[in-house]
Regions:
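Acidic, surface-exposed loops and disordered segments
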Residues: 1-242
Length: 242
């Protein structure tokens, strides 16, 4: 079957040892130089290998006991709840469109059942086998990314942006209201890892705290509270302050 196209929302009309990570400055240097981008140049692309490498760093190796997981995922005493809905704009070798990174393979059925049943979950060609990355929709996703991000151009001028999609209702029903802030702790840790990975790759990231969650859900057909969009992030070539 042919891949579907990205539709605009109705809005205002693992095994990380299998990855070869790039050589980079020391962790201390990256942490000290880490900044949030205020705008992107709308033209910088990143290599698919760099993209896969970044995604590899956010994989928590959920199949392992907590203390055997790669840093920093060994600090979270629960199974990963958040997965990434990726708006890919400028990644060399990847077709622009929407993708999903499933951070815990056991949650793939939950995600598939929570989204439009007509979506085709196509494993990404050339992606490491240990990275559960799926291509959902083909097409220019820049306008959709900008619209759902409160019309912020940073979501479309980047190399890619993403929404952090969390298993929601089931977690809260099973664990109680205390689960809600913990979902954001996990989202925050994801954001910090992405910030440092962007710096290591010679680009820059920034969080997107303003977004329209219902239109995000609409793009992939999320119709209930089983999963919810909690936070957004974007990475690309920064425009430096003068």
């Amino acid at each position: 079957a042919e891949q579907q196209s990205v539709a605009l929302p109705r809005l205002l009309t693992n095994d990380v040892s299998r990855f070869t990570f790039h050589e980079s400055p020391s962790a201390g240097q990256l942490i000290r130089q880490r900044r949030s981008a205020v705008s992107f140049d709308g033209k910088t692309s990143i290599a698919s290998a760099t993209f896969f490498q970044m995604l590899g760093r956010v994989m928590p190796a959920a199949e392992l006991p907590q203390l055997d997981r790669p840093m920093p995922w060994d600090v979270l005493p629960w199974e990963p709840a958040i997965h990434l809905l990726l708006f890919v704009h400028r990644v060399d070798g990847l077709t622009p469109g929407l993708y999903v990174l499933v951070r815990d393979r056991e949650k793939l059925p939950l995600l598939q059942q929570s989204m439009n049943e007509e979506l085709i979950w196509t494993p990404v060609s050339g992606c490491p086998d240990s990275l559960p990355l799926y291509w959902l929709l083909e097409g220019d996703a820049k306008k959709a990314a900008v619209q759902v991000s409160c019309h912020q151009e940073i979501a479309g001028d980047s190399a890619f942006s993403l929404g952090m999609i969390a298993g929601f209702e089931g977690r809260l029903r099973e664990g109680g209201a205390w689960w809600y802030p913990r979902l954001f702790w996990e989202a925050g840790l994801l954001g910090q890892v992405l910030y440092l990975e962007a710096e290591a790759a010679g680009v820059r990231g920034t969080g997107i705290g303003c977004f329209f969650d219902d239109p995000v859900h609409e793009i992939v057909g999320i119709k209930n509270l089983a999963v919810q969009s909690l936070y957004h992030f974007t990475i690309g070539g920064p425009v430096e302050d003068g």
